[in-house]
Amino acid sequence: MSVKETLDMRGLRPQKKWGQHFLTDPRILESIADAAEVTPSDIILEIGPGLGHLTRVLAQRAGRVVAVEVDGDLAAKLRDEFAASNVTIVRGDVLRFKPIELLELGAGTSPAPLPFKVVANLPYYITSAILRHILEAVPKPRVVVVMVQREVAQRMTTQPPAMNLLAISVQFFAQARVMRTIAAGAFYPRPKVDSAIVRLDVFERPPLSVEDTARFFEIVRAGFGERRKQLHNSLARGLGCAPEVVATALARARIDATRRAETLTLPEWGALCDALESVTHFSRDESNAELHKTPNLDN
């Protein structure tokens, strides 16, 4: 039975507001499970199970599957279908749950069994937000396999001199690689662009040692805040720093002030973050010292 026939039989329609495009080729479903190297010992968190086609493949291979679906109609159908299985269906927005909370719902116990893997066919419009949510979570998955727009896959895996905020956000936490591309014709309804399967092998520890991850990404966002601008300009404006402070930090990090954000490597961003923190702390300490200096009563 085709995807369209399945939807018609269940009285369902693809919801544009949730960016729903359903895979029609069973071989691709197997490719996704292969990319995640799913085994009977695995706990899988699936995001956006849709009609449950990938869920069935995962359930045949994994020890346990927890699938979170935002569409209430689809979630209800899935609950009926997988009632007596190793699959738990959670109705809700994945961004409103910590991954550990979803796993605990699936396990029926606390704490949830760990480690785990994430498998998802992500809606194009919310890909970045979901990836950030998963990769910044504690605990983190060991592996993330996602179907995304091909252009997004290319942005995630790019290297200097074509870096971008998404690439840094992903590569800070994981090694990313494109496993295969998928033609638009493999989906119903057919999207306007091709897709790709991307595998993220999540680091146990980030390759960069930064004291404050939030501050690190604040600096990176500032660097990319004005496209095609030189770093000394975009950082000064984005961080609200004096130009001389930014210039000093760039010099300490041994980064040419005229370079652009997309040319920096991850280690260079780490060095720049450390340098900016050092310079700004020094500036604050110096200002505080001036404020608290004992006044000269002889004048």
Language-model-detected regions and their locations in the chain:
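Non-catalytic DNA-recognition/assembly elements of restriction-modification systems
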Residues: 274
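Short helix-coil junctions and helix-kink-helix linkers
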Residues: 236-238
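Mobile late-domain/C-terminal helix-loop "cap" segments
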Residues: 253-257
